[in-house]
Amino acid sequence: MRNNDAKRRSDLLRRRSAPLITPSELGAEASKDIAGGMNAVLTDVFALYMKTKNFHRHMSGPHFRDYHLLLDEQADQLYAMTDAIAERIRKTGGSTLRSIGHIARVQRVIDNDADYVEPLDMLAELREDNQNLTARLREVHEVVDEIRAIATASLIENWIDETERRTWFLFESSRRGD
């Protein structure tokens, strides 16, 4: 019985220490650069998703329905990005996020845990967060463009467009009529 337990433990330890490196023609240094930039973006996308869902759930006021639906749509779009980003990192030979703790340590999006936030303040805060995400995506695009990670650059271009659209909708939705 002891030998069987020792063998299982040995097998488990061996599997845990096995390298998780996907071969990539981009090379180890490029894979590291892609993973670094894309993981930073991924943490921000997860944090922005959570903030958007938080505001979606705690929306109140005369424009509740419109804002509630807008934020739900935007949160869905952000969540859809997460797996594509993580899989892109893995496809190019990198390692990606493993926990909520990892996200919390790296994210640059500032959480908002306030009990109440005015609806227009919610939209303004999300607009600013999306603008910052656009800037970060552009920074990573420069890196992947330089190392000719064409598929990664192409995905980032689409995400920039989606993020600019979210920013635009948040801006237009928060304008006050005269």
Describe the role of every protein-language-model region:
Residues M1-P23:
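Acidic, low-complexity proline/glycine-rich segments
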Residues P19-V41, P119:
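Disorder-to-helix initiation segments
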Residues E25-D33, L48-E73, V140-A151:
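Helix-loop segments that flank and shape redox-cofactor active sites
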Residues K32-L42, F46, D72-A75, Y79, ...:
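Short amphipathic alpha-helical segments with heptad-repeat character
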